[in-house]
Amino acid sequence: MSASLLQFVVLLGVMAALVVPVGNWLYGVATGQKDTALERLTYRVIGINPRERMDWKRYGLAIVVSNLVMLLLAYLLIRLQGALPWNPAGLAAQSPDLAWNTVVSFMTNTNWQAYSGEQSLSYFSQMAVITTFMFTSAATGFAAALAFMRGLAGRDGTNLGNFWVDVTRLIYRVLLPVCFGLALVFVWQGMPQTLGAYANATTLEGAAQRIALGPVASLESIKHVGTNGGGFFSMNAAHPFENPTPLTNALHILSMLLLPSALTYVFGRMLGNLKQGWVIFGGMLVMFVGFLGTVYSFEQAGNPILSKLGAEQAITATQAGGNMEGKEVRFGIAQTSLFATTTTAATTGSVDSMHDSYTGMGGFVPMLQMMLNNVFGGKGVGFINFVQYLVLGVFIAGLMVGRTPEFLGKKIEAKEVKLTMLAVLAHPLSILGFTALACVLPGALNSLNNPGPHGFSEILYAYTSGTANNGSAFAGLSANTFFYNLTIGLSMLMGRYLTLLPMLAVAGMLAAKRRVPAGSGTLPTDTALFGALTVFVILIVGALTFLPALTLGPVADHLQMLRGVVLK
């Protein structure tokens, strides 16, 4: 137990220690006026004016148009895979519905995979489509967050920045250098990085085996730095080529948390009020630690059904103990629990264990984190989701004292509240709506491999993961069907754009408003009390919205397990 807690403290301590230096670096990237020679060349090639100012409408339009163009190009490349180079295994193109699901998944930073990477995509597709989207989707979300911050901090609604400049700088100055250095470390730790043919080997039993290789290290670095999550191999970070050592596992966890946590400090610097950034960071960290403790407790306690059968599940010198089904022995319960909590908090979606094999309440937490979708979150969208609850918290507090609510010196009026509620409600509408549809269609139910509450949990998890742009899965659901490829693809689009665009509009509207001086009735938003109020609002809204569905799924699954019922 003490060793497990030490791992948590060390990794979270390193993350917290890096918030300020990384935040200062990102702030410099976001506010710098000088362009590098490579950036100026890029602007000339794509024909943009880097000094152009964009309001929220133009910024949002640039996001949508650029994403649509990339979507169409990526779909074409996936469908023509069989005729393109760097395909040593001779893999055929994906079906139209699977190709749709794949390109939408990686364009929205979801990285949901209804396919096995090493058996479905060529080296060219992995690099030209998958890895490229990992950079552009991360930069897009990050850029949207910076524009959102400028709107909240600014006094000019016509200047939320320039989308093309933000994306270019983030890729050149942040993502590429960090990922290049990290990829070198991964190669040193044993990850493959090759364009050569698959390796052929003979097993101990004398059977022939073909071992998939490829440019793994380069994909793995941006996979976690960009909170993408899609794996080169079907086993994702549980595969020894994607995650060969405990050091790479720790680096994966840190990579996922590094930039999202630092964004809170960037926000504080943009506002000129560091306390506001620390309040957001503190609220996220409190929820993260609570969720981590819950996952670890239930997984370390083990499976009561096995305990009744006499299985030894206690921690000893020779075993990690607990519920080790679906987990890597080399990582144990502690690192696995931390990875699962991190990947669903940071909307990454990569896994070093099978979430479908967790206990009922162990699987409850990853699902709930994606439903809330604001505990650190991914590159930008998670931060925006947290701030939308800050706006709600201010609005609720204003109603309680009978005053017009104010946030950062700007009055929160009906338009802002309506757009915020659109962003808040789009999330459960997608998750619960598509889950309900799948539960009443016999064809959709045929994809289940488990009956009862656990089967329902698999469907609920799939649409939660898609809408939250996470990408992890309860893998017992056979999702490569026309229905799931189509509907999960739609849920990804709803989760991405019906959150991002309305909140970008809120930022633009607030930027155009005149600041009002703080009065006796102004609620300060940079205090621990307001941070606690925001966390309370997040948990209450999440509980009221999703608790009925969670009760039918993972909670009922856990209660059945306590009764000794395996599947029913």
Curated annotation (Swiss-Prot):
It is found in: Cell membrane. It comes from the Bacteria. One of its GO terms (cellular component) is plasma membrane. It is a multi-pass membrane protein. Its main location: membrane. Keywords: Cell membrane, Ion transport, Membrane, Plasmid, Potassium, Potassium transport, Transmembrane, Transmembrane helix, Transport. It comes from Deinococcus radiodurans (strain ATCC 13939 / DSM 20539 / JCM 16871 / CCUG 27074 / LMG 4051 / NBRC 15346 / NCIMB 9279 / VKM B-1422 / R1). Belongs to the KdpA family. Disulfide bonds: none annotated. The gene is kdpA. One of its GO terms (molecular function) is P-type potassium transmembrane transporter activity. Pfam families: KdpA. Part of the high-affinity ATP-driven potassium transport (or Kdp) system, which catalyzes the hydrolysis of ATP coupled with the electrogenic transport of potassium into the cytoplasm. This subunit binds the extracellular potassium ions and delivers the ions to the membrane domain of KdpB through an intramembrane tunnel. The system is composed of three essential subunits: KdpA, KdpB and KdpC. GO terms for biological process: potassium ion transmembrane transport. This is Potassium-transporting ATPase potassium-binding subunit. The chain crosses the membrane at residues 8-28, 60-80, 129-149, 170-190, 247-267, 278-298, 381-401, 421-441, 471-491, 492-512, 528-548.
